[in-house]
Protein backbone atom coordinates (compact mmCIF):
# COMPACT_ATOMS: atom_id res chain seq x y z
CA UNK A 1 0.00 0.00 0.00
CA UNK A 2 1.30 3.45 -0.95
CA UNK A 3 1.10 6.34 1.48
CA UNK A 4 -0.14 9.72 0.26
CA UNK A 5 0.80 12.74 2.34
CA UNK A 6 -1.93 15.38 1.98
CA UNK A 7 -0.63 18.77 3.16
CA UNK A 8 -3.83 20.79 2.95
CA UNK A 9 -6.56 22.55 4.91
CA UNK A 10 -8.78 23.10 1.87
CA UNK A 11 -12.01 21.16 2.41
CA UNK A 12 -12.60 20.78 -1.32
CA UNK A 13 -9.28 18.99 -1.69
CA UNK A 14 -9.72 16.93 1.47
CA UNK A 15 -13.17 15.74 0.39
CA UNK A 16 -11.94 14.71 -3.07
CA UNK A 17 -8.95 12.82 -1.65
CA UNK A 18 -11.06 11.00 0.94
CA UNK A 19 -13.66 10.01 -1.64
CA UNK A 20 -11.15 8.75 -4.21
CA UNK A 21 -8.94 6.94 -1.70
CA UNK A 22 -11.98 5.10 -0.36
CA UNK A 23 -12.37 3.56 -3.81
CA UNK A 24 -8.66 2.66 -3.88
CA UNK A 25 -8.32 1.79 -0.19
CA UNK A 26 -6.47 -1.43 -1.01
CA UNK A 27 -3.71 0.52 -2.75
CA UNK A 28 -3.46 4.01 -1.22
CA UNK A 29 -3.46 5.24 2.38
CA UNK A 30 -3.95 9.03 2.68
CA UNK A 31 -2.35 10.79 5.66
CA UNK A 32 -3.76 14.27 6.28
CA UNK A 33 -1.43 16.92 7.71
CA UNK A 34 -3.01 20.36 8.24
CA UNK A 35 0.22 21.79 9.68
CA UNK A 36 3.53 22.51 7.92
CA UNK A 37 5.80 21.12 10.65
CA UNK A 38 3.65 18.02 10.97
CA UNK A 39 3.85 17.45 7.23
CA UNK A 40 7.65 17.88 7.18
CA UNK A 41 8.05 15.49 10.11
CA UNK A 42 5.91 12.87 8.39
CA UNK A 43 7.90 13.22 5.17
CA UNK A 44 11.20 12.86 7.05
CA UNK A 45 10.26 9.73 9.00
CA UNK A 46 7.67 7.95 6.84
CA UNK A 47 8.98 8.72 3.32
CA UNK A 48 5.53 8.68 1.68
CA UNK A 49 5.51 7.64 -1.97
CA UNK A 50 3.17 10.46 -2.99
CA UNK A 51 3.06 13.98 -1.61
CA UNK A 52 0.07 16.20 -2.36
CA UNK A 53 1.10 19.78 -1.62
CA UNK A 54 -1.70 22.34 -1.61
CA UNK A 55 -0.68 25.88 -2.54
CA UNK A 56 -4.30 27.07 -2.10
CA UNK A 57 -4.15 26.62 1.70
CA UNK A 58 -2.95 29.77 3.48
CA UNK A 59 -2.26 27.76 6.65
CA UNK A 60 0.29 25.55 4.87
CA UNK A 61 3.75 26.82 3.89
CA UNK A 62 3.82 24.83 0.66
CA UNK A 63 6.99 26.47 -0.64
CA UNK A 64 8.84 25.43 2.51
CA UNK A 65 7.71 21.81 2.11
CA UNK A 66 8.70 21.79 -1.56
CA UNK A 67 12.12 23.28 -0.77
CA UNK A 68 12.75 20.76 2.02
CA UNK A 69 12.02 17.84 -0.30
CA UNK A 70 14.15 19.31 -3.07
CA UNK A 71 17.11 19.85 -0.71
CA UNK A 72 17.25 16.30 0.69
CA UNK A 73 18.08 13.47 -1.76
CA UNK A 74 16.68 10.93 0.72
CA UNK A 75 13.23 12.42 0.12
CA UNK A 76 13.34 12.06 -3.67
CA UNK A 77 11.28 8.87 -3.71
CA UNK A 78 7.89 8.83 -5.38
CA UNK A 79 6.65 12.22 -6.48
CA UNK A 80 4.68 15.38 -5.80
CA UNK A 81 1.26 16.47 -6.98
CA UNK A 82 1.04 20.25 -6.56
CA UNK A 83 -2.35 21.98 -6.42
CA UNK A 84 -2.34 25.72 -7.09
CA UNK A 85 -5.00 28.46 -7.20
CA UNK A 86 -4.44 29.73 -10.76
CA UNK A 87 -2.77 28.91 -14.11
CA UNK A 88 -0.01 31.50 -13.67
CA UNK A 89 1.24 29.65 -10.60
CA UNK A 90 1.16 26.40 -12.59
CA UNK A 91 3.68 27.95 -14.99
CA UNK A 92 5.74 29.39 -12.14
CA UNK A 93 6.13 26.02 -10.39
CA UNK A 94 6.77 24.12 -13.63
CA UNK A 95 9.53 26.60 -14.48
CA UNK A 96 11.32 25.59 -11.25
CA UNK A 97 12.14 22.30 -13.06
CA UNK A 98 11.92 20.25 -9.88
CA UNK A 99 12.13 16.58 -10.96
CA UNK A 100 10.19 15.53 -7.86
CA UNK A 101 7.03 17.17 -9.20
CA UNK A 102 4.86 14.77 -11.17
CA UNK A 103 2.20 17.24 -12.20
CA UNK A 104 0.85 20.68 -11.28
CA UNK A 105 -2.92 21.17 -11.28
CA UNK A 106 -5.20 24.10 -10.58
CA UNK A 107 -7.87 23.40 -7.99
CA UNK A 108 -10.42 23.09 -10.80
CA UNK A 109 -8.43 20.55 -12.82
CA UNK A 110 -7.43 18.65 -9.67
CA UNK A 111 -11.08 18.11 -8.75
CA UNK A 112 -11.71 16.80 -12.25
CA UNK A 113 -8.61 14.63 -12.54
CA UNK A 114 -7.53 13.29 -9.14
CA UNK A 115 -9.25 9.93 -9.45
CA UNK A 116 -7.81 9.52 -12.92
CA UNK A 117 -4.34 10.48 -11.62
CA UNK A 118 -4.50 7.87 -8.87
CA UNK A 119 -5.60 5.16 -11.28
CA UNK A 120 -2.84 6.01 -13.75
CA UNK A 121 -0.15 6.22 -11.07
CA UNK A 122 -1.12 2.86 -9.61
CA UNK A 123 -1.04 1.26 -13.05
CA UNK A 124 2.39 2.72 -13.87
CA UNK A 125 4.32 2.38 -10.64
CA UNK A 126 7.57 1.35 -12.30
CA UNK A 127 7.81 4.64 -14.16
CA UNK A 128 6.65 6.63 -11.13
CA UNK A 129 8.82 5.24 -8.37
CA UNK A 130 11.96 4.28 -10.32
CA UNK A 131 12.27 7.33 -12.55
CA UNK A 132 15.70 8.90 -12.46
CA UNK A 133 17.39 5.94 -10.77
CA UNK A 134 19.07 4.63 -13.91
CA UNK A 135 20.32 8.08 -14.77
CA UNK A 136 21.92 8.46 -11.34
CA UNK A 137 23.78 5.14 -11.61
CA UNK A 138 24.93 5.80 -15.17
CA UNK A 139 22.40 3.59 -16.92
CA UNK A 140 19.67 4.27 -19.42
CA UNK A 141 16.02 4.80 -18.55
CA UNK A 142 13.23 3.04 -20.38
CA UNK A 143 9.63 2.13 -19.68
CA UNK A 144 6.17 1.65 -21.09
CA UNK A 145 2.70 3.03 -20.51
CA UNK A 146 -0.52 1.09 -20.83
CA UNK A 147 -3.13 3.63 -21.90
CA UNK A 148 -6.87 3.02 -22.11
CA UNK A 149 -9.45 4.47 -24.48
CA UNK A 150 -10.15 7.70 -22.60
CA UNK A 151 -8.82 10.83 -24.39
CA UNK A 152 -8.35 12.56 -21.01
CA UNK A 153 -5.95 9.79 -20.00
CA UNK A 154 -3.78 10.72 -22.97
CA UNK A 155 -3.53 14.30 -21.73
CA UNK A 156 -2.32 13.14 -18.32
CA UNK A 157 0.09 10.51 -19.66
CA UNK A 158 1.75 13.05 -21.93
CA UNK A 159 1.90 15.60 -19.09
CA UNK A 160 3.68 13.11 -16.82
CA UNK A 161 6.20 12.12 -19.46
CA UNK A 162 6.92 15.55 -20.94
CA UNK A 163 7.17 17.20 -17.51
CA UNK A 164 9.70 14.59 -16.40
CA UNK A 165 11.82 15.09 -19.53
CA UNK A 166 11.71 18.87 -19.02
CA UNK A 167 12.58 18.73 -15.31
CA UNK A 168 15.48 16.36 -15.94
CA UNK A 169 16.90 18.77 -18.56
CA UNK A 170 16.39 16.44 -21.50
CA UNK A 171 14.27 18.95 -23.43
CA UNK A 172 13.99 22.74 -23.48
CA UNK A 173 10.95 24.83 -22.62
CA UNK A 174 10.11 25.22 -26.32
CA UNK A 175 10.72 21.52 -26.85
CA UNK A 176 8.36 20.69 -24.01
CA UNK A 177 5.34 22.26 -25.69
CA UNK A 178 6.29 20.95 -29.12
CA UNK A 179 6.68 17.40 -27.80
CA UNK A 180 3.47 17.54 -25.79
CA UNK A 181 1.50 18.75 -28.82
CA UNK A 182 3.04 16.07 -31.05
CA UNK A 183 2.41 13.24 -28.59
CA UNK A 184 -1.16 14.39 -28.00
CA UNK A 185 -1.82 14.41 -31.74
CA UNK A 186 -0.20 11.03 -32.36
CA UNK A 187 -1.90 9.28 -29.44
CA UNK A 188 -5.29 10.86 -30.17
CA UNK A 189 -5.07 9.71 -33.78
CA UNK A 190 -4.11 6.22 -32.64
CA UNK A 191 -7.08 6.18 -30.27
CA UNK A 192 -9.47 7.35 -32.97
CA UNK A 193 -8.21 4.77 -35.47
CA UNK A 194 -8.44 2.00 -32.91
CA UNK A 195 -11.97 2.89 -31.84
CA UNK A 196 -13.26 3.39 -35.38
CA UNK A 197 -11.41 0.58 -37.11
CA UNK A 198 -9.97 3.07 -39.63
CA UNK A 199 -6.58 2.21 -41.10
CA UNK A 200 -3.93 4.78 -42.00
CA UNK A 201 -4.38 3.94 -45.71
CA UNK A 202 -8.15 4.50 -45.53
CA UNK A 203 -7.76 7.82 -43.76
CA UNK A 204 -5.12 8.95 -46.26
CA UNK A 205 -7.35 7.99 -49.17
CA UNK A 206 -10.32 9.98 -47.88
CA UNK A 207 -8.18 13.01 -47.02
Where are each of the predicted segments found?
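Extreme N-terminal starter segment of soluble prokaryotic enzymes
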Residues: 1-4
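Conserved acidic carboxylate
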Residues: 8
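Two-component/phosphorelay signaling modules centered on CheY-like receiver
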Residues: 11-33
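A short, well-structured beta->alpha microelement
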Residues: 27-45
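Output/docking surface of receiver
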Residues: 34, 83-127
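Conserved phosphotransfer microenvironments
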Residues: 36-39, 49-71, 76-77, 84-92
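Bergerat-fold GHKL ATPase/HATPase_c domain
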Residues: 116-181, 192, 196-206
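Conserved polar catalytic motif of the HATPase_c/GHKL fold
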Residues: 185, 189
